[in-house]
Amino acid sequence: APDSAWGQRMHSAFNTQWSALGGDITAMTTLTSELSDNETIANSLATLQSESRIKEIEKAFEAPVDSQARRRTDLDSVVLLSPTPQMAREIRPLLRFHYAGKLPVYAPSTIYQNGSGIANRDLNGIQFVLPASALATDSSRSQPLHALGLDAAALIDHFDQARETTGTLLFGETGDLSVDTMGNVHRRLKPAVIARGKARAVL
């Protein structure tokens, strides 16, 4: 996450929710202006330490060693808390460079900019969530408002039924909607992955 108020809020919210679900955060890395992103990622994945050990062995034996630097092995996924597509496009290639390219990467929808197919290719493989309407081919800026209007109209017709019947779902344009007994509307988004620079639904 970036060293900013947004980054702190996102990390706190994610840590709280992940811990409530029984998850464990092995390490948390903050991107600051004091170090380059490359140095920060290298330190976080311990590839610099691995490279240093190889150099020490080569120095001790006065001969090259047929070995490749490795990342730490206690990670099973990466959560990239990026507020912008640009930041995510800079970090994703660095993960690949530092031998973490095969780890699943998850991120908020702030990383994705519809209609930027070529630029989005650096984000290929990242998984996130989007409203169903955002997975459509139409990239009009008015589309989110149109989708919200459609769902609002549909909820008006089924609001009381959804509130009184537990488990009722409305498969709307902005996500899967439900209403609790207090009348609060809950929304579940669609899982997506970036492939060939475009968001694709995860089936």
Go through the PLM ranges and name each one:
Residues A1-L203:
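Extracytosolic ligand-binding ectodomains
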